Amino acid sequence: MQTDREQRLIDTVAWVRIEDGRILCARPRGKDVFYIPGGKREGAETDLQTLVREIREELTVEIAPETVAHVGTYEALIPDAVVRMACYTADYSGTLAVSSEIEEISWFTYADRPHVPPVDQLLFDDLVAEGLLAA
């Protein structure tokens, strides 16, 4: 059995886009679960660089770097790892569309919480408590 120190860290960055009380979620190709859009850092990328690249790759839009604001950082245990998700809001330009990596995008309310992973559920909890996410 691994101790907490031995657990692998999955370090991710996510884009929190809320419109009309709903949060944007994406389902990658070949997966059954929806995620907050974003992904893992490549090399020595900063959070901002990761966010801009991942959102361009997944949703074909451009994040406006000057509008990026940190929402919070969340951690959750999964088997054999800890997932850390640094969350940011930002404006964007372009039209949201799925890329070759994404099967489907959808706008979720708090009622859809069971359809996202544990780390995303923590964000959902905070957003509904702040009145930003519809129940």
Where does each model-flagged region fall?
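Conserved N-terminal beta-strand and adjoining loop/helix that marks the start
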Residues: Q2-I23
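Short, solvent-exposed loop/helix junctions and linker helices
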Residues: L9, A44-E45, Q49, V82, ...
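Active-site-adjacent beta-strand/loop module that shapes the phosphate/pyrophosphate-binding cleft
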Residues: D11, Y74-V98, E103-W107, L123, ...
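Conserved Nudix-box catalytic region and its N-terminal flanking loop in Nudix hydrolases
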Residues: I18-E58
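Short loop segments at secondary-structure junctions
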Residues: E19-R22, D91-T95, Y110-D112
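Nudix hydrolase/Nudix homology domain
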Residues: R29-F34, V98-A135
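Short histidine/acidic/glycine/proline-rich micro-motifs that form metal-
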Residues: R41-E42, E75-A76, D112-P114
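A short coil-to-beta-strand element that immediately follows conserved catalytic motifs
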Residues: E62-G72, Y88
